[in-house]
């Protein structure tokens, strides 16, 4: 644990590789990397964690070793690839994101964590598999280091298991550079990393943390009302006017960099909001946004990022902004359209098709005022264009979703929060402190700003309770917790090399971070048993207490309760005799009751300890039972159905492989039918989501979809009964419009189609493109299946999916990968 000021001068040469003085945590990181150990860096956004990754690349490439850089999202992978290529022109870089593959034999490979996990998992269980491998690197011998950017994704509800399995499966010889936002339990996590290999521990983990920001943050609240409303307040509520008007259209300090929380200013803001509500004063969103933006411009607090946690409001708010954000003498308004065209022309061959898009023209309208938008519903190419403009200092105001805060190195002078709550898939909730700090941390540019500003647009959201507001800005960082669970894939991969070995799988699961929590629970429960046993032993038994007599007495009481009233009356006298025969009955009953409670508590704890110990073996047995029931394992060996399933990752493989066999290798389906079939596993959302099969489809496709639906429900229900995880996601028919896209042949037709799905269905161009690329990836996986089962007809039908879908602006291109 690196807490002392760094004083060693032996690495001065290494430190001098960077043109600025290094912080202590950066120096410790370089020492760890130089000595071949692991490093876990936990620090706020903007603290300089990138230095650690860059040194690791320089160091291990100089040793002739390969480096893998993993990131949580494709957009971050693409940007890192571009940035690192520019920074280190003498080092070769490659990228693998599922959609894009470029230079897979490079010195440094940048990839999503899923791709590395899938490769490691298959290598762990089946070293003979070459069909599905995305890259041919000899991990055991040639890989020197893996850099995990944003390693706090380890706790992500849906994807955390990917990070955990990747860390579990990496060989002990490979150094880890783990970069994370501040976390609450770094020591526990670091110890788990060290102990993964038990007796084969080869490396220590350096834990280097910092709470220091190079550019400190100051957090403000902000309220405004119109001049007319202010005049009304002055006339009708003079005392309130005197009290509040000096705090309107002002930045009221909420928190300094020293973690202090200004309760007085919070109270002022709440009082103003209360007065506005009681006086029925209406402050519309457009007025609030324009007033704040004018203030930011006047106070020289641009560029600014507005985080808007509802995608539909991003464009709405952007077009509310009335004034040009550029300085009066700036020529950027007149040149930015040509700049955008140049960015696209230099990045992609079909740039003219993007220039024709209404979305592009709409974006240009905003850009001419220094304003841009950024969210997942926008085409990746256009999002990247915005990122490039921001990185070159050509934008003044960016309105974006929370995703922009994840990793993308785009600091600004000011960040603005338009809400403190978000929809998380199941309902609205307040932001976690870690989420808030990730967004707030984008404020403050190293080398440009003395302080970064964080503004809360209190006009636009309900204020939290005071203690919640304080915790949001000053709360503990997130605690890393395991999301590990066994999976169908792990069981099948284990069976692909041998017969089912539950002990081996249980041992593998025992290396997970989940085991740390399980062992902690067991230790706590054992301590509770010891405490209860001591307390139990200290109970004072009444002198004349007799177990047999008391048991007989209690049974007689139970018997009386079960008989008729008439019989019960006759038994009362007998009961009284029994009472008279027991000396000190009240104390005997109290002792017996306490004794029973101790026994029950200890028994329950012992039962729970047993359940904890058998967590994984029970889970594994349930997975194996399901795989046997559905025909993936037979006689403890993987069947052909299991072999097929292992080639599928993009969709629930248990369902799709079973469907393939049940529907005779899809022999009755055309290529278009297959595209429609693959389209039902998507994450798109429409104005009116479609969860039922449309009537317009042909009989063969409809019949296949019904079979798929029934199979999906069956597998889901069976998994729920066994309390195991089957898969995420649900079937929907939101992307069946893809059929119409297949007939598009001209740019005009493409624009008409894309306009139609946006206006009629609420399906954005970015979402449509992402879902379309997924269908192509499913087709590629199913092609591997067709090759595996020697089905030439199916392989032929699948071979044209890519060319039918990938056209016009619906592509996997990236401006960062050219």
Predicted feature locations:
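Conserved C-terminal RecA-like helicase domain
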Residues: 69-70, 78, 85-97, 284, ...
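Helicase-associated low-complexity/disordered flanking segments
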Residues: 1-39, 216, 246, 323, ...
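Conserved two-lobed SF2 helicase motor
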Residues: 105-121, 369-383, 389-409
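Non-catalytic terminal extensions of ATP-dependent helicases
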Residues: 368, 372, 377, 388-395, ...
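Conserved Walker B
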Residues: 150-152, 395, 404, 420, ...
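Conserved interdomain linker/interface between the two RecA-like ATPase lobes of SF2 helicase motors
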Residues: 168, 175-177, 182-320, 372
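Conserved P-loop/Walker A NTP-binding site and adjacent catalytic elements of P-loop NTPases
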Residues: 20-214, 222-223, 304-308, 316-326
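Conserved segment of the helicase C-terminal RecA-like domain
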Residues: 410, 414-424, 429-469
